[in-house]
């Protein structure tokens, strides 16, 4: 049993992947809350309730924006570590999501500092549905990756 750089990468990736799973679960909960608030017909005509709703939507979008860059950076760190450790299969599995993250980041709206989640555009049912599907797909990817990293870590520790 030998401790190699690849084993260290898998250990660190396990911990960071758990944090990414929590990030994505938070995204799913936030999108569900936005969808529920969007469909709630109670107090539609009350202006005070409308202002409160808008503040709640802006608060949720602000929190969502704060998680985007750390998620992308952590996933980029995964790819960089696996590139340095010459773990080509693992890098190949992570590369499509990294490219999607880069595409999504560089194609974000450039009309200010709103970032990916704008309080006005997120309430469009199509955009909200897309974001929710994206979060569920990321959750599936990160969960499968977590168990793959666990298996690879054990295999790397035992095989050398």
Swiss-Prot record:
It is a multi-pass membrane protein. One of its GO terms (cellular component) is membrane. Signal peptide: none annotated. Residues 1-10, 94-138 are cytoplasmic. GO terms for molecular function: signaling receptor binding. The keyword Transmembrane applies. Residues 32-72, 160 are lumenal. The keyword Transmembrane helix applies. One of its GO terms (biological process) is synaptic transmission, glutamatergic. Expressed in the odd-numbered neuromeres (r3 and r5) of the developing hindbrain. The chain crosses the membrane at residues 11-31, 73-93, 139-159. SMART domains: Cornichon (SM01398). It is found in: Membrane. Keywords: Membrane, Transmembrane, Transmembrane helix. InterPro entries: Cornichon (IPR003377), Cornichon_conserved (IPR033466). Belongs to the cornichon family. Interacts with HBEGF. Regulates the trafficking and gating properties of AMPA-selective glutamate receptors (AMPARs). Plays an important role in the proper development of cranial nerves by facilitating the secretion of HBEGF. This is Protein cornichon homolog 2. It comes from Gallus gallus (Chicken).
